[in-house]
Swiss-Prot record:
PANTHER family: PROTEIN PREY, MITOCHONDRIAL (PTHR33505:SF4), ZGC:162634 (PTHR33505). Gene3D superfamilies: 2.20.25.10. GO terms for cellular component: cytosol. This is UPF0434 protein HEAR2489. HAMAP family: UPF0434 (MF_01187). It holds the Pfam family Trm112p. Belongs to the UPF0434 family. InterPro entries: Trm112-like. The lineage of its organism: Bacteria, Pseudomonadati, Pseudomonadota, Betaproteobacteria, Burkholderiales.
Amino acid sequence: MDTRLLDILVCPLCKGPLEHDKKKQELICKVDKLAYPIRDGIPIMWADQARDLQTPAAG
C-alpha cells in the first residue's frame, strides 16, 4: 500500500487516522475498533465491509 495514500485516507465513520496491518492486509481504525480490508491493493472503505475488532474470531 502506497504510504502517500495512507496519509490521506481516514476512517469513513469517525474521520480518524488509520493504521496499515500489512500481515492481515487491513486498515485499522483504533477509535471505532474496525478493520477495513484491502483487496488487490484497493482499500474497501465501506463500514458494512469492515471487520469488528471487538467481536471474537471464530475458531
